[in-house]
Amino acid sequence: MLGLIMTEYKPKRSRNIYSPNQEKPFKLSRSKVESFMKCERCFYLDRRLGINQVPGFPFNINSAVDELLKREFDQYRERAEPHPYMVDAGINAIPYQHEQLNKWRENFVGIQYFHEPSNLLLHGAIDDVWKSEEGELIVVDYKATSKKDKVNINAPWQRSYKRQMEFYQWLLRQNDFQVSNRGYFVYCNGKRNRDAFNEKVEFDVDLLPYDGNDDWVDTTIEKIVTCLNQDEIPNPDERCDQCKYNQEVIQYY
């Protein structure tokens, strides 16, 4: 007998829906800004009409790596010492100690900034922040994968990783921190060239530098507000798989 596969998807909600000219600030996460960048139509259906996007599957192994890296870097944070990864990479910095760090890392809280012209409360949960010898904050993002080739951030789909880092840099700057354009991806690549599993996966760890440019953020916020305030649903995006799927399915209704 086949087991029943249950889904947690709830297509329609009544909360966290944008209303034009609302007085209360509208909370918008970094991931929702990325959703707008990918498809204005799907974003509008979600944030303006309350039709949830279909969620992806959780990457629990990645989450475990993320949590363990945070604990590991926190040990060096407490001692105000650089992690050996940083020393080996020649990075003159230490993990940054700040009373709000745990909030900055917390999902649905994160670093927040109220953008008064748009009435948007923008936020994003970071993985880590380091502080350079010059006193600038360095945004750090943890990534985990398993591939035969050496990791890099050059694939077209990884542009979203770069925007993610740039958005965090922008949030910190809006909170009056001095932030370096250069951030780092702590990229963990699970090794496959072992004879057996033996209850563990070993990783190669690379620190990949990236020089961000957050100039796009303010312009994007303006476009988001314009999108949310319009009454017409944006046209389907030819780059969006969900839109393409919907366009095919609708022919049979």
How would you describe each model-predicted region?
Residues 2-136:
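Metal-dependent nuclease catalytic cores that hydrolyze phosphodiester bonds in DNA/RNA
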Residues 6-9, 19-21, 27-28, 171-253:
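Metal-dependent nuclease catalytic regions and adjoining charged, substrate-binding loops involved
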Residues 39, 168, 243:
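Calmodulin-binding IQ motif helices
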Residues 44-45, 52-54, 147-150, 191-195, ...:
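Short catalytic/ligand-binding loop motif for oxyanion handling, primarily in non-cytosolic enzymes
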Residues 55-56, 152-156, 231:
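Short, polar/flexible loop-turn hinges at active-site or ligand-entry regions and domain interfaces
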Residues 106-219:
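Mg2+/Mn2+-dependent nuclease catalytic core
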